[in-house]
A protein has these predicted regions:
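Residue(s) in the substrate-gating loop at a strand-loop-helix junction
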Residues: 103
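Conserved NAD(P)H cofactor-binding loop of Rossmann-fold oxidoreductase domains
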Residues: 52-56
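Short, flexible catalytic-loop segment of classical short-chain dehydrogenase/reductase
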Residues: 9, 147-157, 196
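Substrate-binding pocket helix/loop in short-chain dehydrogenase/reductase
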Residues: 59-60, 67-72, 172
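Active-site helix of classical SDR
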Residues: 83, 120, 128
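C-terminal substrate-recognition "lid" of short-chain dehydrogenase/reductases
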Residues: 80, 180-209, 214
Length: 215
């Protein structure tokens, strides 16, 4: 069984219409009380995939304290809360698998105007490796996915909001060594692999999927 959570009811409804076999639940993963209620109804969890994320644009000079706090709350604290709540169940069943969404803009490389975003994604790398090291004896694996630029609706919105959308799109493509963006399906395929028993000997690893951007 697969359960998808999101703070956006419209997103969940659309997802459920496309994939009617999955369960959906509205959840703010930055709210510990909501997380506790959600997981209280679930006895067994094989895989937890943390994919929530927020991108703040700007250097440290454009990053106010509220931007820093909001970015870390959404990108890092949400994972901390979700993992901490689910770990007792995984420890009890002596098996578990956690996948966290990081980015190549992290400890892997820097990118202009992604100051706090890169800091949060680097924190996720450390979080992932620490969980993997602490709970390996409980047969719990923890890995991270580090995408480059992915063609998603949010990416399309960013391009459309640019002063010159045509130029913005060309500039994005020009920065890609392979000459294209990643697809959401390619990221999902890596997540499925990490969630499967085929990756049973892999833990504590950050997996770049960036078309060569981090070379």
């Amino acid at each position: 069984n697969v359960t998808a959570t999101d703070i956006n009811e419209k997103t969940l409804k659309s997802l459920n219409e496309e994939f009617p076999n999955i369960k959906v639940s509205i959840l703010d993963s930055t709210k510990n009380d909501e997380i506790k209620v959600f997981f209280s109804k679930i006895d067994k969890v094989d895989v937890l995939f943390n994919a929530v994320g927020y991108v703040h644009h700007g250097t440290i000079m454009e990053c106010e304290e509220k931007d820093w706090d909001f970015s870390f709350n959404v990108n890092v604290k949400s994972m901390y809360l979700m993992i901490k709540e689910i770990l007792p169940k995984m420890i009890k069943q002596n098996k578990g698998n956690i996948i966290n969404m990081s980015s190549i803009v992290s400890s892997l490389r820097g990118l202009p105007n992604r100051f706090v975003y890169g800091a949060t994604k680097a924190a996720i790398v450390g979080l992932t490796k620490s969980i993997a090291a602490d709970f390996i004896k409980s047969n719990i694996r923890c890995n991270a996915i580090a995408p480059g630029t992915v063609h998603t609706p949010s990416w399309e919105d960013r391009v459309a909001a640019a002063p010159d959308p045509v130029k913005a799109k060309k500039d994005f493509i020009a920065r890609q060594p392979m000459g294209r963006l990643a697809t959401a399906e390619e990221i999902a395929a890596l997540a499925v692999y990490l969630a499967s028993d085929e990756s049973d000997f892999i833990t504590g690893v950050v997996h770049p999927i960036d078309g060569g951007m981090s070379i």
